[in-house]
């Protein structure tokens, strides 16, 4: 990809925009950065660019700048359907994501992981497996480290593991991972997409440029994902918790079995620190993607056994009066909450709600009816969730997250579980899911009595 001397527009600042701008400037591009936020809101990021000779257009998007650019690189937080981008595309300007830009300069084989839920856990675990095998690995993408940072670092790694959101996949053209993983697809981000099908189509682009020399690792327990097997050009490697596979990776009676080209490997889930039905899927996907990439089976198994998981994902906080409190603030959509509820039997007090993302809460109905003893709702979405689920169990509404914890403490009995799994984003009441998690954890730790960890 030729960059020197080109007029390149970076849309959206934040961490990814900064990394892209610095890379482009280092390669001799004429860089302009545009963001709808004002200078005062972007002060921390602007400090990281003050040594560069570039143009800034803040608080607005100038359509003329879009039309005069040779290349437009869009940060993940910017919708691809804003009018300046649509106009630029209509005028045949090249519009790509940071992922597409970075991949053009990376020679190492790549494992790319997407799905509605489980991406970060699977990506992190795959990276840990490669590292346990002595493979120098870059782990990044939607997980927090922009892929372009690998290019700017100059590090010659042997392997790349990248987490991809639907937003990042919207802007690819030639991006081609050696192993592409699709974990699941459920309704999400319908506040950004015109339809559910548009969201699905964005996810499926991960396979777009693969060939028969590549692998598609597919969760065949998910009907939407399983259907991909008939359309992808790469070799399909399935994984399942529900059925035995002649070739692929599956879990039966607590044993994960990996079968490929006549060989068979077994991993006992009893030895794993990472618990939860949904995490078995994540583990199988991580094992499949790394073993297909040449990871040592024994070292891979040891890496899985020692992996404890990530914060804010079904994290045990403490026990109070015999009631176990779990924080799952990363459960920002209905599909994720389904998996979390499936990890417990009856007697759940569920705290949910936040900023509505546009999807239906109906998929939670059976689990709420069968397993949720008390439902406590917060945030902008509480009225809508109550309308869809409130008649299925004992339901309460709370003004704040702290109030919700207090209500849960009053209602839950010894031997039961309080689960905070919102099914919504956090932006109505909090900066992000991490701040929301810390507020919940602080409220739980403030409860009198119990075992605090």
UniProtKB/Swiss-Prot annotation:
Binding site for ATP: 115-121
Keywords tagged on the record: ATP-binding, Cell cycle, Cell division, Cell shape, Cell wall biogenesis/degradation, Cytoplasm, Ligase, Nucleotide-binding, Peptidoglycan synthesis
GO molecular function terms attached to this record: ATP binding; UDP-N-acetylmuramoylalanine-D-glutamate ligase activity
Chief location of this protein within or outside the cell: cytoplasm
Keyword ATP-binding recorded: yes
Reaction(s) the record says it catalyses: UDP-N-acetyl-alpha-D-muramoyl-L-alanine + D-glutamate + ATP = UDP-N-acetyl-alpha-D-muramoyl-L-alanyl-D-glutamate + ADP + phosphate + H(+)
This enzyme's EC code(s): 6.3.2.9
Lineage: superkingdom: Bacteria
N-terminal signal peptide: none
Pathway: Cell wall biogenesis; peptidoglycan biosynthesis
A GO CC term attached to the entry: cytoplasm
Compartment(s) where it occurs, according to its Swiss-Prot or TrEMBL record: Cytoplasm
GO biological process, one term: peptidoglycan biosynthetic process
Gene3D superfamilies: Mur ligase, C-terminal domain (3.90.190.20), Mur-like, catalytic domain (3.40.1190.10), NAD(P)-binding Rossmann-like Domain (3.40.50.720)
Reported function: Cell wall formation. Catalyzes the addition of glutamate to the nucleotide precursor UDP-N-acetylmuramoyl-L-alanine (UMA).
HAMAP family for the chain: MurD
Name of the featured protein: UDP-N-acetylmuramoylalanine--D-glutamate ligase
Organism: Geotalea daltonii (strain DSM 22248 / JCM 15807 / FRC-32) (Geobacter daltonii)
This protein's encoding gene: murD
């Amino acid at each position: 990809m030729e960059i020197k001397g080109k007029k390149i527009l970076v849309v959206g600042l934040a961490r990814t925009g900064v990394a892209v701008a610095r890379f482009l400037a280092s390669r001799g591009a004429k860089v302009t950065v545009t963001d709808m936020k004002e200078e005062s809101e972007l002060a921390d990021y602007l400090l990281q660019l003050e040594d560069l000779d570039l143009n800034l257009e803040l608080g607005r998007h100038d359509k003329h700048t879009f039309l005069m650019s040779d290349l437009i690189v869009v940060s993940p937080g910017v919708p691809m359907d804003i009018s300046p981008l649509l106009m630029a595309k209509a005028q045949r300007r090249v519009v790509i994501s940071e992922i597409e830009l970075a991949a053009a300069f990376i020679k190492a084989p790549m494992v790319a992981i997407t799905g509605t839920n489980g991406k970060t856990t699977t990506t992190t675990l795959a990276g840990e497996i490669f590292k346990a095998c002595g493979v120098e690995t870059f782990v990044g993408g939607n997980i927090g480290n922009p892929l372009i940072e690998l290019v700017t670092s100059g590090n010659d790694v042997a392997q790349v593991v990248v987490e991809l959101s639907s937003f990042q996949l919207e802007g690819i053209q030639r991006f081609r991972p050696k192993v592409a993983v699709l974990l699941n697809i459920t309704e999400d981000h319908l506040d950004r997409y015109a339809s559910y099908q548009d969201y699905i189509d964005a996810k499926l682009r991960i396979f777009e440029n693969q060939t028969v020399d590549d692998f598609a690792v597919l969760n065949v327990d998910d009907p939407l994902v399983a259907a991909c097997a008939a359309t992808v050009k790469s070799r399909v490697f399935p994984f399942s918790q529900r059925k035995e596979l002649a070739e692929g990776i599956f879990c039966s009676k607590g044993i994960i079995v990996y079968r490929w080209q006549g060989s068979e490997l077994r991993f006992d889930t009893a030895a794993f620190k990472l618990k939860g039905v949904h995490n078995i899927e994540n583990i199988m996907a991580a094992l499949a993607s790394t073993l297909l990439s040449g990871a040592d089976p024994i070292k891979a198994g040891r890496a899985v056994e020692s992996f404890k998981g990530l914060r804010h994902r079904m994290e045990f906080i403490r026990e109070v009066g015999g009631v176990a409190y779990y924080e799952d603030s990363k459960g920002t959509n209905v599909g994720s909450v389904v998996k979390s509820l499936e990890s417990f039997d009856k007697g759940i007090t569920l705290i949910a709600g936040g900023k509505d993302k546009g999807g239906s809460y109906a998929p939670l109905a059976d689990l709420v009816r069968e397993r949720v003893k008390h439902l406590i709702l917060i945030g902008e979405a509480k009225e809508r969730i109550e309308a869809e689920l409130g008649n299925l169990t004992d339901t309460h509404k709370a003004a704040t997250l702290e109030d919700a914890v207090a209500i849960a403490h009053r209602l839950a009995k010894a031997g039961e579980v309080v689960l905070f799994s919102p099914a919504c984003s956090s932006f109505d009441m909090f900066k992000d899911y991490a701040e929301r998690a810390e507020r919940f954890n602080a409220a739980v730790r403030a409860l009198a009595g119990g075992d605090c960890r």
